[in-house]
């Protein structure tokens, strides 16, 4: 699925517009799935607006399109599991369950594993019974068998690295580390201020309705958010060739927590605050993106035009960007291969992350 979105962007805009259109499609799907979940659980609409800010996380900035698409697939899985009644598993229901599991697997194997975990945990919470859980799990056996055959064949492609854990407790749970895992795309005070505002929003809602108890919470979404938080807290930061193994779950956890928690009570003015805050944040982010492109990518078209056909290219990236965290230009030299063909000294496409393998 991570290849499908830029592929759809390639059709109308060509290779140089494929990335932008693909990310736009991913953003629409991510936010649309979030609002669908919010509406299905009958939560306040303003909660989905607040939760939408977590689209702009390091997952987006690092280009983990498959993981973004997996969020959409998992919400479909969540809703199917929620609406499928316990009892006799008909062929139609079994096919639907298999199709939803296959969609999870084809987007990202981590989401497939998480989906299986949610099937068990939520099934036990709902007291579906062992037989019903086994019936549903049996629908996923062909997918699990495919994963067992496929994964060993590609695990050693490209680069591998040792499993990495944070060296200290503070390395994961300090305020700075939490802010980087929750958003982590842009340098400066913009993202920490936004995260603080979201946490304040959650806190106000909880405080205002503290006497209502569990009635104002969505218990299933709170359980889901807890599983996301657990994945962020206990998983390694890096495993094999999977970067941000733990951190990628925190934006999902916070977005789900915002929907699960009670929204603050107040007049229309208070409900206007999240929309205004999201608009200002998106405007600031857009200006920073534009500034980065104008200052860091000036002349790239001329450079590509000056190269011969099918060159051999060595890509080097040593300078930290003053706007973005991470390394947004790590693969900029890959545009040479898109425009002129040839060979690169390194490409993330060299190792398989899905059923598509680059040779």
Where do the protein language model's features map onto the residues?
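Hydrophobic/aromatic-rich transmembrane helices and adjacent perimembrane loops
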Residues: 240-266
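Short periplasmic/luminal acceptor-recognition loop of GT-C membrane glycosyltransferases, typified by
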Residues: 293, 303-359
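Hydrophobic alpha-helical transmembrane segments in integral membrane proteins
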Residues: 239, 282-305
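Transmembrane catalytic cores of multi-pass membrane glycosyltransferases
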Residues: 1, 95, 99-221, 233-248
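Signature aromatic-anchored transmembrane alpha helix within multi-pass, membrane-resident enzymes
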Residues: 198, 259, 263-288
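Membrane-embedded helix bundles of polyisoprenyl
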Residues: 24, 28-37, 44-85, 93-122
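Membrane-interfacial loop-to-transmembrane alpha-helix junctions, especially the N-terminal start
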Residues: 43-46, 90-93, 136, 212-226, ...
């Amino acid at each position: 699925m991570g290849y499908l979105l830029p592929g759809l962007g390639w059709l109308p805009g060509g290779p140089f517009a494929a990335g932008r259109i693909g990310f736009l499609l991913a953003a629409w799907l991510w936010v649309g799935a979030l609002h669908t979940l919010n509406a299905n659980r009958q939560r306040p609409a303003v909660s989905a607006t607040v939760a939408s800010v977590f689209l702009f996380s390091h997952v987006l900035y690092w280009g983990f399109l498959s993981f973004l698409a997996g969020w959409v697939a998992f919400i479909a899985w969540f809703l199917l599991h929620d609406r499928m009644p316990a009892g006799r598993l008909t062929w139609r229901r079994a096919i639907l369950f298999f199709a939803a599991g296959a969609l999870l697997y084809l987007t990202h194997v981590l989401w497939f594993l998480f989906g299986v975990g949610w099937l068990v945990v939520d099934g036990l919470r709902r007291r579906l019974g062992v037989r019903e859980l086994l019936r549903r799990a049996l629908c996923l056996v062909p997918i699990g068998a495919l994963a067992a055959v496929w994964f060993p064949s590609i695990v050693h492609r490209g680069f591998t690295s040792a499993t990495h854990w944070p060296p200290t407790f503070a390395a994961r749970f300090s305020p700075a580390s939490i802010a980087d895992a929750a958003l982590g795309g842009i340098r400066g005070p913009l993202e920490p201020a936004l995260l603080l505002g979201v946490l304040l929003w959650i806190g106000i809602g909880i405080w205002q309705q503290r006497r209502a108890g569990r009635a104002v919470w969505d218990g299933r979404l709170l359980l889901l958010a807890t599983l996301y938080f657990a994945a962020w807290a206990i998983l390694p930061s890096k495993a094999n060739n999977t970067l941000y193994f733990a951190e990628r779950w925190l934006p999902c956890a916070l977005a789900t927590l915002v929907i699960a928690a009670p929204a603050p009570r107040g007049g229309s003015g208070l409900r206007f605050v999240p929309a205004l805050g999201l608009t200002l944040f998106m405007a600031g982010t857009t200006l920073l993106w534009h500034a980065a492109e104008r200052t860091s990518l000036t002349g790239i078209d001329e450079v590509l035009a000056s190269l011969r056909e099918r060159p051999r290219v060595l890509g080097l990236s040593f300078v930290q960007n003053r706007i973005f965290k991470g390394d947004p230009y790590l693969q900029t030299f890959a545009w040479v291969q898109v425009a002129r063909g040839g060979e690169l000294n390194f490409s993330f496409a060299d190792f398989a992350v899905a059923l598509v393998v680059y040779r």
